From Swiss-Prot:
UniProt xrefs under InterPro entries: Znf_C2H2_type
Swiss-Prot/TrEMBL induction comment: Expressed during multiple necrotrophy, the late stage of host plant infection.
Keyword Signal tagged: yes
GO MF entry, a single one: zinc ion binding
Location, primary (coarse class): secreted
Position of the signal peptide: 1-19
Coiled-coil region: none
Keyword check for Membrane: no
Protein name stated in the entry: Host transcription reprogramming factor 9
C2H2-type zinc-finger residues: 54-77
GO cellular component, one term: host cell nucleus
Organism annotation: Pyricularia oryzae (strain 70-15 / ATCC MYA-4617 / FGSC 8958) (Rice blast fungus)
Compartments, as annotated in UniProt: Secreted; Host nucleus
Amino acid sequence: MQFSKITLAIVLYALGTAALPTASRCAGAPGRDVAATRGAKLQAREEDKPTPQYRCDKCEKEFVKGNDFFNHGGRGHCKMSGY
């Protein structure tokens, strides 16, 4: 009885992994961008990039993180503008 449960589990696992999509299967599928080569570097799409939340009034530079903005000299103390 135990042997048949183990065999059944292996068969179900094999069927489940065979049904999952792989990079080679998805490469030709419409609407799917899949990197199927080794060492490929993925870059964020334009809509995935974070939008800047902070902007320096003096030099017009935009920042995503508040720490970068305040280290830059935000709130009127811009280090880039020479003030």
